């Protein structure tokens, strides 16, 4: 038969269902989930580029294996979850795509291993444990539809990345326990892990024509910091899991945050806020989970509530009890009380 095998698989109904699944999942993905390039793309990843080792401490390995009950699939799910959260924090994007090889089947040859583009939408309000369970379902769904050829999927999607020969993902993650080595798909970074008894060892292969080693070292350091914090406290919301090292925290919070300014004596907090709202009305003032307010929106909401409080008899020498869960409404209420001339008394909602 003259046609290659992947071409005749269109007659397979299961394969058509797989194609529809992947097209539906990836049709709206327009940007690669990757790091900022140090250099213009100068060649695709070819497996013979630079390599950096990943050092997972004995304590981290023990916590990971305990969290995943020593299961290789759940171990991979945990690594994938941490990687996606790290990329979400780096890029600011809610939709993150990471590459994975097809899951290894018993007796399967490693001559041709399909690539899968694993896409997820991240919500900062989810806990790491909740996202871990979500990621588990995403991976199970993907691996149950892993036969549809990656090269055909790129052609099916017909967006600029596919037409220009760029991949659907730029970072791939593999675990030797459940994967063969993936065929070359054009990605620039591949994170690979092996489990040896009670230790987990990792390495990163990356395109040195695109990334400087320092960039990859910094990113993998953040990945490990985030992974350590997540497995230590799986109930933490993914938007608040720390990933900076202590020296980086000091630089950001102290060295880069030298924002001392002379403020006229007697100036109130809400007056400073109003001045800032006048200077940058459309700038982001408050963000909590999926809620955001610009300075203009926050000022307008606070003014409306302040007028209501004043009409209700609130003013100087008045104390207003405030019992609200953390949200943008909490900031609106704080500003409104101050604008009315009163003081607020915070009460724990629980």
Language-model-detected regions and their locations in the chain:
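Short amphipathic alpha-helices and their capping loops
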Residues: 1-50, 169, 175-176, 249-261, ...
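Carrier-protein-dependent adenylate-forming modules in NRPS/ANL systems
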Residues: 1-5, 36-37, 62, 90, ...
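His-Asp-centered acyl/peptidyl-transfer active-site segments
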Residues: 2-19, 50, 67-80, 90-186, ...
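Short amphipathic alpha-helical/adjacent loop interface patches that line ligand
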Residues: 19, 83, 136, 220-224, ...
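DNA breakage-rejoining catalytic core of tyrosine-based enzymes
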Residues: 47-61
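Low-complexity, glycine/alanine/valine/leucine- and proline-rich hydrophobic stretches
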Residues: 181-198
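Short, highly charged C-terminal tails/helix-capping segments
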Residues: 238-251
């Amino acid at each position: 038969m003259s046609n290659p095998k992947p071409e005749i698989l269109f007659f397979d109904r299961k394969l058509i269902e797989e194609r529809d699944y992947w097209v539906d999942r990836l049709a709206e993905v327009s940007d690669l989930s990757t790091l900022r390039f140090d250099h213009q793309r100068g060649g695709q990843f070819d497996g013979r580029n630079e390599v950096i080792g990943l050092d997972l401490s004995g304590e981290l390995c023990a916590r990971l294996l305990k969290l995943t009950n020593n299961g290789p699939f759940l171990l991979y799910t945990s690594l994938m979850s941490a990687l996606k959260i790290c990329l979400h924090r780096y890029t600011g994007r809610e939709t993150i795509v990471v590459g994975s090889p097809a899951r290894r089947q018993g007796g399967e040859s490693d001559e041709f291993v399909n690539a899968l583009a694993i896409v997820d939408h991240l919500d900062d309000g989810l806990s790491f444990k909740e996202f871990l369970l979500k990621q588990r379902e995403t991976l199970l769904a993907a691996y149950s539809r892993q036969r549809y050829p990656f090269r055909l999927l790129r052609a099916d999607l017909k967006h600029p990345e596919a037409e220009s020969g760029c991949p659907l993902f730029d970072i791939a993650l593999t675990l030797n326990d459940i994967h063969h080595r993936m065929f070359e798909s054009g990605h620039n970074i591949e994170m690979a892990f092996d489990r040896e008894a009670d230790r987990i060892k990792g390495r990163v292969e990356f395109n040195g024509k695109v990334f400087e080693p320092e960039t990859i070292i910094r990113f993998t350091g953040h990945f490990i910091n985030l992974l350590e914090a997540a497995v230590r406290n799986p109930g933490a919301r993914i938007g608040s899991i720390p990933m900076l090292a202590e020296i980086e925290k000091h630089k950001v919070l102290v060295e880069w945050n030298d924002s001392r300014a002379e403020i006229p004596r007697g100036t109130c907090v809400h007056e400073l806020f109003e001045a800032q709202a006048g200077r940058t009305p459309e700038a982001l003032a408050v963000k909590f989970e999926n809620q955001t307010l610009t300075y203009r929106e926050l000022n307008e909401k606070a003014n409306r509530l302040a007028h209501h409080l004043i009409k209700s008899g609130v003013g100087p020498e008045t104390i207003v009890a405030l019992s609200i869960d953390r949200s943008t409404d909490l900031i609106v209420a704080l500003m409104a009380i101050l604008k009315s001339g009163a003081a607020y008394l915070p009460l724990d909602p629980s």
